[in-house]
Design a protein with these regions (language model features):
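Structured-RNA-binding interfaces characteristic of tRNA pseudouridine synthases
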Residues: 1-125
């Protein structure tokens, strides 16, 4: 079964999306959380990769598993093992030919650059 999920994260504490040995990444944390509820090493594929410190509101991922459980159990289970700065927002079973990167119909990026002499209290990350 192939599962697609939407991931939201605050990336300031991570070295980007892509997993790397001995470095804290978003993908690495998600795959560790999936392992915690499945006891299987499951690889995830994302619609795109973000750099260190970058946040995401709706990064789409997919992964394959033979385990069957309600979709809300995937969401709650994975979230229970993730740091608070990473959240799975939803999960859906998708067709086997769905691909998070290649099936995307559009991508949206927003850049916020503060050009001021005083640091922002709410934009400090």
């Amino acid at each position: 079964m192939r599962i697609a999920a939407s991931v939201e994260y605050a990336g300031q504490d991570f070295s980007g999306w892509q997993k790397q040995p001995k470095i804290k990444t978003i993908q690495g944390e998600i795959e560790k959380a999936i392992f915690s509820i499945t006891n299987e090493n499951i690889d995830t594929t994302a619609a795109g990769r973000t750099d260190a410190g970058v946040h995401a509101l709706g990064q789409i991922i997919h992964f394959d598993t033979d385990l069957t459980r309600p979709m809300n159990s995937w969401v709650k289970g994975i979230n229970s093992f993730l740091p608070h700065s990473i959240r799975i927002k939803w999960a859906h079973e998708v067709s086997p030919d769905f691909h998070a990167r290649f099936s995307a119909k559009r991508r949206e990026y927003q850049y916020l650059l503060l050009n001021q002499s005083i640091n922002s209290a709410i934009m400090s990350h």
